[in-house]
Amino acid sequence: MADRHNRDLDRKPAPLPEALPVPCVDSHAHLEIVTNTDAESPEVGAVLEEAASVGINRVIQVGYSAEQSEWSVRCAEKWNTKVLAAVA
């Protein structure tokens, strides 16, 4: 996707935090920015698995434009037990 919020794409990800004591939901995510891939890509699944490893078992994927909202819906369709789509 072309729109990446002017982020530094070369920066290294932060280390993972300790796992949460109970399962939680990430209430506002932009997986399209993190992965820069198609919604159905295995890279999205890898990010979801990484989140699960620290206690985030569900993600609300927020679309902020028509294109990102469509991406969010495709993502929720593909990863339906782990992702819900929302529109901001």
Where are these regions (language model features)?
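Mid-domain alpha/beta scaffold segments of enzyme catalytic cores
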Residues: 1-88
